[in-house]
């Protein structure tokens, strides 16, 4: 059972800092829980975690992702979190972060704003109902019944849910300046900072997504994002050569986002795990370091001429 406080502050940043880092709000994955986030080392800032308030009763969200986002906005406001925040999460948590950020663009004078998105192995999403068959997920029978029911409820939503319609790239698609590993980089639009396994940061070119914005569409600019990408595919119990649903873009640096969505991911870090063991004990120290690297990028990221 999760704490009644929702969101719950799971880390507190240093009170001695002259300029306190932007707080981070992490959103649960499809399990509905936030236990994995409690296991992380210090992220050097205030960190909050939102669990699914429907978890204990296994109640599905009848209004889908839109209802969830609206409710979580109220939770963040009620917790007294104000001003600029970073928003993110593992897997489904990344999708919810993007949905919340999109909902905020339609609110006049919101009490908080999303200045960056942290995606932890959240691949580009296409509704399951529109995709060809894929390999089954691993056997989850060893997990508690409430967790398995939560997986089932979110699978139903993901079967038809589509990503919110952002119409403009992050930071107006301008060349940016940001810090990573204590160094400063200048990164042009259409390029990202990328850290492959066992290597340092590289400035690499990505595929471009062409979005013909209609004059009738509202200009909705994405927040910049940083991505943790699992480098391994999920082991399966079958002889199928098809990947699991979450591994459809495993071979791509940005997990399918660059060729299917307006440009918003500014940095990507590879981690030598698969989607379902990224938070296991032996991987936590490395993952914490990599998350801090991504947070450094998001803290420092700004268009040339503005920083």
Curated annotation (Swiss-Prot):
**Sorted alphabetically, which SUPFAM superfamilies does this protein's record hold?**
alpha/beta-Hydrolases
Q: What induces it?
A: Expression is positively regulated by the KK-1 cluster-specific transcription factor kk1F.
Gene3D superfamilies in the record, alphabetically?
alpha/beta hydrolase (3.40.50.1820)
Name the job this protein performs: Probable thioesterase; part of the gene cluster that mediates the biosynthesis of KK-1, a novel cyclic depsipeptide with 10 residues which is a promising active compound with high activity against many plant pathogens, especially Botrytis cinerea. Within the pathway, kk1J is not essential for the biosynthesis of KK-1, but plays a role for efficient production via correction of peptide chain synthesis by kk1B.
Q: What happens when the gene is disrupted?
A: Decreases significantly the production of KK-1.
Class of enzymatic activity (EC top level): hydrolase
**What gene is behind this protein?**
kk1J
Q: What is this protein called?
A: Probable thioesterase KK1J
> Which GO biological-process labels does this protein carry?
antibiotic biosynthetic process
In alphabetical order, the GO MF annotations are: hydrolase activity
| Similarity comment: family membership | Belongs to the AMT4 thioesterase family.
Q: Which UniProt keywords apply?
A: Antibiotic biosynthesis, Hydrolase
- Give EC number(s), comma-separated: 3.1.-.-
Keyword Hydrolase listed: yes
Q: Does the keyword Cell membrane apply?
A: no
Give the pathway annotation.
Secondary metabolite biosynthesis
């Amino acid at each position: 059972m999760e704490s009644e406080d929702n969101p719950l502050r799971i880390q507190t940043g240093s009170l001695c800092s002259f300029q306190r880092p932007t707080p981070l709000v992490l959103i649960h994955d499809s399990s509905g829980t936030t236990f994995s986030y409690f296991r992380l080392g210090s992220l050097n800032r205030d960190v909050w975690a939102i669990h699914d308030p429907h978890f204990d009763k296994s109640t599905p969200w009848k209004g889908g992702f839109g209802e969830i986002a609206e409710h979580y906005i109220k939770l963040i406001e009620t917790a007294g979190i104000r001003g600029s925040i970073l928003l993110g999460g593992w897997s489904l948590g990344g999708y919810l972060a993007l949905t919340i950020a999109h909902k905020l663009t339609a609110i006049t004078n919101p009490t908080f704003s999303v200045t960056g998105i942290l995606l932890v192995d959240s691949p580009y999403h296409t509704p399951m109902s529109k995709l060809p068959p894929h390999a089954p997920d691993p056997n989850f029978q060893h997990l508690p019944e409430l967790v398995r029911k939560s997986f089932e409820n979110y699978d139903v939503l993901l079967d038809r849910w589509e990503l919110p319609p952002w119409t403009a790239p992050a930071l107006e698609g301008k060349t940016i300046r940001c810090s990573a590993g204590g160094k400063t980089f200048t990164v042009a639009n259409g390029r990202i900072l990328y850290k492959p396994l066992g290597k340092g940061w590289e400035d690499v070119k990505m595929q471009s997504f062409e979005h013909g914005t209609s004059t009738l569409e509202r200009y909705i600019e994405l927040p910049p994002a940083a991505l943790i990408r699992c480098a391994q595919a999920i082991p399966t119990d079958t002889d199928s050569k098809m990947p699991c649903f979450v591994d459809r873009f495993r071979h791509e640096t940005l997990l399918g986002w660059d060729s299917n969505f307006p440009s918003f991911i500014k940095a990507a870090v590879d981690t030598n795990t698969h989607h379902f063991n990224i938070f296991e004990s032996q991987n936590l120290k490395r993952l914490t370091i990599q998350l801090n690297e991504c947070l450094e990028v998001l803290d420092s990221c700004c268009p040339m001429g503005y920083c």
